[in-house]
């Protein structure tokens, strides 16, 4: 390394290291995860207990990963290949099984994107209309709409009409393909199959990406573009022939531009590659010529790809004079936690032009920044970072909310019993971040290799970008493979430390491990009261049509409207909750809500007064006198009847089902069929504990056994040479 390159590597490792340390603190002190286990935001003792469990669990996960790595080291080259195939198969099965276990109702942007692509594929429309309420504001999803359109059109042409499932399978293949591409890229990048196999192992151990496969959106569809760029970049490093340089450079050019159109964050790894290429070729004439040739090919192909993409976009998109400018997202990111702000969106949606929105956004940016002190700005950025990067689940459960079919397995993945899986993901996520710190420490100390900069710069780019952009927890998904790759290499940097020959050092490691493992079990035992004795209200969704796109049903009470929704259920429930919006300025309204079973028998009925009910709950809730147990997939009829008043306090909503049928059933308003379904949820609520005492003690016993196996595995004398694999 030159002095400048060495300085740059140290600078990157220090800056990224500080950001990762901040992430580690927010991973440990994650209130949301703590509430999954305590259900009591005011119980400081129980929350501190959960924080301690996450911290110790993360450390134990690091040690457990070292034990698994040691087992992988024993395999021959053929054994590594077989294990890699098995791991890819497990990853693929988990990803695809998720879309069948959780065929969620599309929500938010995913709904708009798929709905529009299906309309185009079926020939209902042939353009992306800039006058549309959604695409008039956002043109950044045009590329994914067109990709899905061509895909859907091909399947529709051969007679496949269930295009929603086509999208889910395609999304699953994108996730699987990205992981496979990363595997081959790491083989090329490091020259060691064992490293790539360990990457696959960690990818399988963290289920967050696989469980996001039902969410058909750019965050997952862009992942194979990142993986492809990484693989081609690794090929370029090893390339010795002009043909290889041309092919890989051209592919990078295409993937960078198309990937950027799908989701702009794809460009980070391309920019990181250019920066690393500069350092790689610095003061080396032969490498400099190779880099210049590669960049020239990449630039020519990228420019051509950009013009082609621009032409396709102009062909299909009519344009809009009310698109949200970049400043809108920056201004939104400075408010609150930096999350999506519905009120701010509505404010700009009401404006007349992009120029007006841009001026208002710039004004808000200046005013907000002026209102911050350095301390409050730091707190704001810390909250943003915590929201996006501090949860090991990457918020997959937020994309599994909309369901029209209940399976008991749902409870443990995304339902009320998901707390243990969330804790597991959190501990593993903490372990990954700890291993990234090790990776960065090695980068800081290393004076010979510049390869490690590629992933570090990419991740740093993502972290910095989302400091100035709107954040959502799911937006971290495209970077999970990069985080796992860095964690894998960090783990390899320290795994041999657990098998050093010096007796005193081995005793030190043994003592430290036994202490942490024992303390972890002790904390689990001390948590028995909160897990197995403290009562909580468990709310299990059986049907949930809340997250999809809303249409208003106005004046239900004032005009004596009758809403009638049929639906099907096959498991116990005792409560209904409606997606409705309260209007405090209209306090006088009454509604009669009736639920009948398949035999037309009334099983729940109540007349609601706004003053009596809505002021307390801010929502409409129908409780059954007792739990109802349906026969197999029984049909129910839900009726909401307005009783007449001067105005409506409550505004009911229904989901637009012109292309995507959210619920099996039918909605009628005053006897007229509506192309949609009422937005409501069917639930079973009960007072219970988080986990029964026998189940919790069994879990603790399994963890103790795993700790013992890790101890036996790690502290053997034999070590394995990895240099040739």
Protein language model features and the residues they cover:
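Multi-pass, polyprenyl lipid-linked donor-dependent membrane glycosyltransferases
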Residues: 167-174, 198-233, 259-269, 475-480
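Loop-to-helix entry region of an early transmembrane alpha helix in multi-pass inner-membrane enzymes
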Residues: 138, 142, 156-180, 419-428
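Start-transfer (signal-anchor) and selected internal transmembrane alpha helices
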Residues: 1-97, 289-300, 512, 516, ...
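Membrane-proximal stem/loop segments at transmembrane-domain junctions that anchor or position
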Residues: 123-127, 313-402, 613-615
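Short hydrophobic/aromatic helix or loop-helix immediately within or flanking a transmembrane segment
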Residues: 115-118, 133-160
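Transmembrane-helix motifs of polytopic, lipid-linked glycan transferases
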Residues: 169-190, 228, 434-442
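Membrane-proximal lumenal/periplasmic loop motifs of glycosylation machinery
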Residues: 100-108, 124-146, 168
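Membrane-interface anchor segments at the N-terminal boundary of transmembrane helices
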Residues: 43-55, 166, 384-455, 683-700
